[in-house]
């Protein structure tokens, strides 16, 4: 019998509910499916006996408290665990998870009956790390949703375990499940005071051992290119092709500083959205860099290119809206490494080697840390996230739940 008897069942139930976020929405949460899912989590938390369960109208988060069972917890830090409920911008309708029991670490895993989508060790060598594991995969038509419903299931199962085992001493624990992490707005209205933790963790990482406290600095740039459309037969010296302006802008950026050509601490510009006509074109970029100075230089370059093009054109035909999204939380956490050190100790106590390296992305913890609550990121188990080749090991999910409990125990000492 599994240590956390409802962990996998809970996860499978969660992923079958669509909770895709929508960056074009103006509501919080951005989709009604997230609203309903979070209401369901609130009821589940109440059913487990957690207290002060409430959903914030401002942020969409559900917060809950597991009271301390210590005789004296005056010197025990209140710890929080946070995960997001939304899934990335990929088909998440009618998720049909499949379980591959006792994977041999070598065989191809056919996702769909036709064999159009296959997990292979040649393309995904990390599969070799999972010999003997039970893997949950997709059926090839959707993502899985382990990012981050594995984290939700792990936190929920840890709380359930603590309630069933009152002999485990712990201080006060806070739980937060929120929306819209995938579109970068989830933590914008996170209320640190209402949450009430001294330190916190997002459970939103990948493979076993991941412990992250360094993220990108991040910004988004939306550009509008204004053209002039006339008949092609009389276009000479009159037509201004907005599509060509967008191409010229893109070609002015460093060709090798893109996601597919960078790694580690190397930053990039990423053009991920384009639409347009001769009359008007629109592009959207994300700008990423771990180094704040380089980050600011990247943003300035984008502004400078727009200004130069407008000067050459003799009028404003390139309009740029540049907005910061989040910052590298290392700036906050390196001032007080308590949360990181405790997570490292917890993993080592469990025989897990902490894998610490800069995240080529961000978490809700990036924003929450800058709000005054240090929030590094713990592994949740997912691999190949955001697409049809996503999978997760049930054994790694169990280990992630173990780490949550070990952190709680260490803080209670």
UniProtKB/Swiss-Prot annotation:
Protein localization: Cytoplasm
Q: What is its EC number?
A: 3.4.11.4
Q: Per the record, what is one GO cellular component?
A: cytosol
Q: Does the keyword NADP apply?
A: no
Instruction: Tell me the cofactors it needs.
Output: Zn(2+)
Catalysed reaction(s)?
Answer: Release of the N-terminal residue from a tripeptide
| UniProt keyword terms in alphabetical order | Aminopeptidase, Cytoplasm, Hydrolase, Metal-binding, Metalloprotease, Protease, Zinc
Cofactor info, note text: Binds 2 Zn(2+) ions per subunit.
One GO biological-process annotation of the entry reads: peptide catabolic process
Q: Which GO terms describe its molecular function?
A: metallopeptidase activity; tripeptide aminopeptidase activity; zinc ion binding
Residues that bind Zn(2+) 2 = 147, 182, 386
The catalytic site is made up of 86, 181
Q: Where does Zn(2+) 1 bind?
A: 84, 147, 204
Q: Member of which family? A: Belongs to the peptidase M20B family.
What is this protein's function?
Answer: Cleaves the N-terminal amino acid of tripeptides.
- List the HAMAP family: Aminopeptidase_M20
Instruction: Supply the name of the protein.
Output: Peptidase T
**What organism does this protein naturally occur in?**
Ligilactobacillus salivarius (strain UCC118) (Lactobacillus salivarius)
Gene for this chain: pepT
């Amino acid at each position: 019998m599994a240590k956390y008897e409802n962990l996998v069942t809970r996860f499978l139930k969660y992923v079958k509910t669509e909770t895709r976020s929508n960056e074009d929405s103006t509501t919080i949460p951005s989709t009604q499916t997230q609203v309903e899912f979070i209401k369901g989590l609130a009821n589940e938390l109440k059913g487990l006996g957690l207290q002060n369960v409430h959903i914030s109208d401002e942020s969409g988060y559900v917060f809950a408290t597991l009271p301390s069972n210590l005789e004296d917890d005056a010197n025990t830090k209140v710890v929080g665990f946070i995960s997001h409920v939304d899934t990335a911008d990929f088909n998440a309708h009618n998720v049909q998870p499949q379980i591959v029991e006792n994977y041999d670490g070598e065989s191809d895993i056919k996702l769909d009956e036709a064999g159009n989508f296959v997990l292979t060790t040649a393309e995904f060598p990390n599969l070799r790390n999972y010999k003997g594991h039970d893997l949950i995969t997709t059926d090839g038509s959707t993502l899985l949703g382990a990012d981050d419903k594995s984290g939700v299931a792990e936190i929920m199962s840890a709380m359930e375990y603590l309630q069933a085992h009152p002999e485990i001493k712990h201080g006060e624990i806070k739980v937060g499940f929120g929306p819209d992490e995938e579109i970068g707005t989830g933590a914008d209205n996170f209320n640190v005071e209402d949450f009430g933790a001294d330190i916190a963790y997002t459970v939103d990482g990948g493979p076993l051992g991941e412990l992250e406290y360094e993220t990108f600095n991040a910004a988004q740039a939306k550009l509008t290119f204004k053209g002039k459309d006339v008949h092609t037969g009389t276009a000479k010296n009159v037509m201004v092709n907005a599509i060509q302006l967008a191409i010229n802008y893109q070609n002015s950026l460093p060709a090798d500083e893109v996601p597919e050509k960078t790694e580690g601490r190397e930053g990039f510009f990423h053009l991920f959205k384009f639409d347009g006509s001769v009359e008007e074109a629109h592009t959207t970029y994300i700008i990423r860099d771990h180094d704040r100075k380089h980050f600011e230089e990247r943003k300035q370059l984008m502004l400078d290119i727009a200004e130069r093009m407008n000067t050459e054109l003799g009028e404003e035909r390139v309009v740029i809206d540049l907005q910061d999204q989040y910052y590298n939380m290392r700036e906050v956490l390196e001032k007080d490494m308590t949360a990181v050190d405790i997570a490292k100790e917890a993993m080592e106590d469990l025989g897990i080697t902490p894998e610490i390296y800069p995240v080529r992305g961000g978490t809700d913890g990036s924003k929450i840390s800058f709000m005054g609550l240090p929030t590094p990121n713990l592994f949740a188990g997912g691999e190949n996230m955001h697409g049809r080749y996503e999978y997760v090991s049930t054994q790694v999910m169990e280990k992630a739940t173990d780490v949550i409990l070990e952190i709680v125990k260490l803080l209670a000492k």
